[in-house]
Amino acid sequence: MSKVTQIAHPLILHKLAIIRNKNTGSKDFRELVEEVAMLMAYEVTRDLPLEEVEIETPICKTKCKMLSGKKMAIVPILRAGLGMVDGMLKLIPAAKVGHIGMYRDEETFKPVEYFCKMPQDIHERDIIVTDPMLATGGSAIDAINALKKRGAKSIRLMCLISSPEGIKAVMDAHPDVDIYVGDIDERLNEHGYIIPGLGDAGDRLFGTK
């Protein structure tokens, strides 16, 4: 069964409040999304396996713990998921980055895939799918479907804010995928947008309409 983790760290909630503010411009919005992604990545990677290694300090030899070299991949859902990648790469710079492009049909609210490019060994990697907003859950579900078709077995989903409906939809469709969110909002409105939300994350990241 999926595990849902709300990473309610004071720094994350503070930065999310600024991100939500309609008066926050694209430059600050981009920087804050990157910062929150980096802070969240700290928790998302908490259970990475460690191994004991021997190193030599300027004083003596000693044993320390280091990451065991498990392969990782970050897969942003385009466009908005791109804004979270650089923050995560600061903590896990060896991760490879795949891309899934989706847009939402404004009439059906359903996602349409238009691009997918993955590392050749994606099936061997622990994958973190990124999208700032988990609204209906449709894009995340389809992105995870696309990864599983390519043999992926270890997948986590990381979002800045989510709706209860989106969380339930992903859990029902993919009970093996753990979900990490910065904040859980009230609900979706009749147009499928998160309330109170933060607007269109892609438009606010890139200054488009």
Curated annotation (Swiss-Prot):
Belongs to the UPRTase family. InterPro entries: PRibTrfase_dom, PRTase-like, Upp_B, UPRTase/APRTase, Ura_phspho_trans. Uracil binds at I194, G199, D200, A201. Pathway: Pyrimidine metabolism; UMP biosynthesis via salvage pathway; UMP from uracil: step 1/1. Its EC number is 2.4.2.9. This is Uracil phosphoribosyltransferase. Pfam families: UPRTase. It is an enzyme of class 2 (transferase). PANTHER family: ADENINE PHOSPHORIBOSYLTRANSFERASE, URACIL PHOSPHORIBOSYLTRANSFERASE, CHLOROPLASTIC. It comes from the Bacteria. HAMAP family: Upp_B. Keywords: Allosteric enzyme, Glycosyltransferase, GTP-binding, Magnesium, Nucleotide-binding, Transferase. GO terms for molecular function: GTP binding; magnesium ion binding; uracil phosphoribosyltransferase activity. It catalyses: UMP + diphosphate = 5-phospho-alpha-D-ribose 1-diphosphate + uracil. Allosterically activated by GTP. It comes from Clostridium novyi (strain NT). GO terms for biological process: UMP salvage; uracil salvage. Its cofactor is Mg(2+). Catalyzes the conversion of uracil and 5-phospho-alpha-D-ribose 1-diphosphate (PRPP) to UMP and diphosphate. 5-phospho-alpha-D-ribose 1-diphosphate binds at R79, R104, D131, P132, M133, L134, A135, T136, G137, G138, S139, D200. Binds 1 Mg(2+) ion per subunit. The magnesium is bound as Mg-PRPP.
